Amino acid sequence: MKYMITSKGDEKSDLLRLNMIAGFGEYDMEYDDVEPEIVISIGGDGTFLSAFHQYEERLDEIAFIGIHTGHLGFYADWRPAEADKLVKLLAKGEYQKVSYPLLKTTVKYGIGKKEATYLALNESTVKSSGGPFVVDVVINDIHFERFRGDGLCMSTPSGTTAYNKSLGGALMHPSIEAMQLTEMASINNRVYRTIGSPLVFPKHHVVSLQPVNDKDFQISVDHLSILHRDVQEIRYEVSAKKIHFARFRSFPFWRRVHDSFIED
């Protein structure tokens, strides 16, 4: 089996990476960072997100595993003390694949410029490049509202525990193939109104954000943030692609939520 290990880059994570590579050397395991079947991330959820985007073109062929060397993460749920056990289980191939939905973001520009497509594991946000943020929200080609405020956030089910939660969005179980739109400081008064609530969209629904005046936006996809100019439309939909995790034991999503936000 081919595998690769990525590290946060701190001393603890780098040492654990070297020890695991040495451990895999006792089994029929080949280190391959070009076409791995298993990708192990050592660090935290940020390190895991980087690993995901590094291999997002090969998601169907890869199963991911996260080891946290700091706080418990939603994607990095193995502890360093369990690394030897993980090596043995992986070498025996004793795992199941669990899949989570992803978010597809398509940015369309003015005439003469090719559209850009992005894949998110957590979320995508849209903010103004400097002026007022005003967009028309269109759902399945039907105008829903004109939004005025600081910005909008569209998240995956697993990503609802990240930025979405801080915006007051609901937490969604990753078995639900959906996406959630939350507002950032919307303007609501006698003249301007928005729905004022998070919106959950099922698979096959398409949400389009269309500029009203300013066409320059700061668009983020997970940890990547880029200034996009002359934007004509931003489209969100549940991706046909999924991320696959190698699971060796039961660790229910709601237990993970409890341990992360209530008590460990």
From Swiss-Prot:
EC number: 2.7.1.23
GO (cellular component) term, any one: cytoplasm
Obligatory cofactor(s): a divalent metal cation
Enzyme class: transferase
Effect listed in the UniProt record for changing H223E: Twice less active than the wild-type. Its activity toward DTA is increased 2-fold
Primary location recorded for the protein, binned into one broad class: cytoplasm
Positions contributing to NAD(+) binding: D45, G46, N122, E123, R148, D150, S158, T161, A162, Y163, N164, K165, S166, H223
Keywords of the record: ATP-binding, Cytoplasm, Kinase, NAD, NADP, Nucleotide-binding, Transferase
GO MF assignments: ATP binding; metal ion binding; NAD binding; NAD+ kinase activity
Active-site residues (renumbered): D45
Free-text activity regulation comment from the record: Competitively inhibited by 5'-thioacetyladenosine (TAA) and di-(5'-thioadenosine) (DTA).
Role of this protein: Involved in the regulation of the intracellular balance of NAD and NADP, and is a key enzyme in the biosynthesis of NADP. Catalyzes specifically the phosphorylation on 2'-hydroxyl of the adenosine moiety of NAD to yield NADP.
Similarity-based family: Belongs to the NAD kinase family.
Assembly and oligomerization: Homotetramer.
Protein name from the UniProt record: NAD kinase 1
Organism for this UniProt entry: Listeria monocytogenes serovar 1/2a (strain ATCC BAA-679 / EGD-e)
The encoding gene: nadK1
